[in-house]
Regions:
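ATP-dependent carboxylate-amine ligase
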Residues: 1-182
Length: 182
C-alpha cells in the first residue's frame, strides 16, 4: 500500500526499490536476533493462539532443521486461551518450551499448568518457569539449520511479577545466550 501511494505521489519506482533493503519491520514482530550463530533466532509478540500458529508456520517455511519455540502466557489475562496457546505451541514446534510471561499477580506455576493442560510433555520439550533459563535451554539445544522462536513478549522490555516490573528484553536475553554459548 505504501509503495502504491509513493508511486502515485510521483516517487520513482527505482528509488523505492533501492530503499527496500534499508527497511526494517516492527520491533518485536518476527525480529531476527543474529550474532553470527549457525541457526535462526527470532523474537515475536505472538500472544494469541492464532498468532502462535501463524509465526511457527511461517518460520517452518525456511527452517531446514527443527523449530524450537519458547512461549508463556500473561497473568491477569484471559485464562481460557492458555490451553489453546499450549496446543498451538505443541502442534507448531518440534520442541516446545513452556515458560513464564508477565505472571503479574498470578502464580506462574498455575499459568503453566493451564497452558500444558492434559497434553503430554516429553523430552526434549520442557516446562521451565524462569524465562531466561528457558531461552538459554533453547539455545543450548539448537543445532545448525534450526530456528528458535521466542514468543509472547516481542518488543516488551519488562517482566511483571507480583506487581513489580523487572527489566527483561527477550531480544537481549536471546542475544546474550547465543553469544555465551559460542
Amino acid at each position: 500500500m505504501a509503495i502504491a501511494i509513493a508511486v502515485e505521489s510521483g516517487v520513482d519506482p527505482i528509488d523505492i526499490a533501492g530503499s527496500a533493503p534499508k527497511l526494517s519491520g516492527a520491533a518485536g514482530r518476527l525480529e531476527e536476533v543474529n550474532v553470527g550463530q549457525t541457526f535462526n533466532a527470532f523474537v515475536d509478540y505472538a500472544h494469541t493462539p492464532d498468532a502462535v500458529s501463524n509465526v511457527l508456520s511461517a518460520v517452518r517455511e525456511f527452517t531446514a532443521g527443527r523449530v524450537i519455540a519458547v512461549l508463556g502466557c500473561g497473568g491477569d489475562r484471559d485464562s481460557s486461551k492458555r490451553p489453546l496457546m499450549g496446543s498451538a505451541l505443541i502442534n507448531g514446534a518440534d520442541i516446545a518450551i513452556f515458560t513464564s510471561d508477565n505472571p503479574r499477580s498470578e502464580d506462574a506455576q498455575v499459568i503453566l499448568q493451564q497452558m500444558v493442560g492434559s497434553q503430554e510433555i516429553s523430552d526434549p520439550a520442557r516446562v521451565i518457569e524462569d524465562r531466561k533459563s528457558a531461552i538459554e535451554y533453547a539455545v543450548s539445544i539448537a543445532k545448525p539449520g534450526d530456528t528458535i522462536a521466542v514468543l509472547g513478549k516481542g518488543h516488551e522490555v519488562g517482566q511483571e511479577i507480583s506487581g513489580e516490573k523487572h527489566p527483561f528484553d527477550d531480544r537481549v536475553v536471546l542475544a546474550q545466550a547465543i553469544a555465551g554459548a559460542k
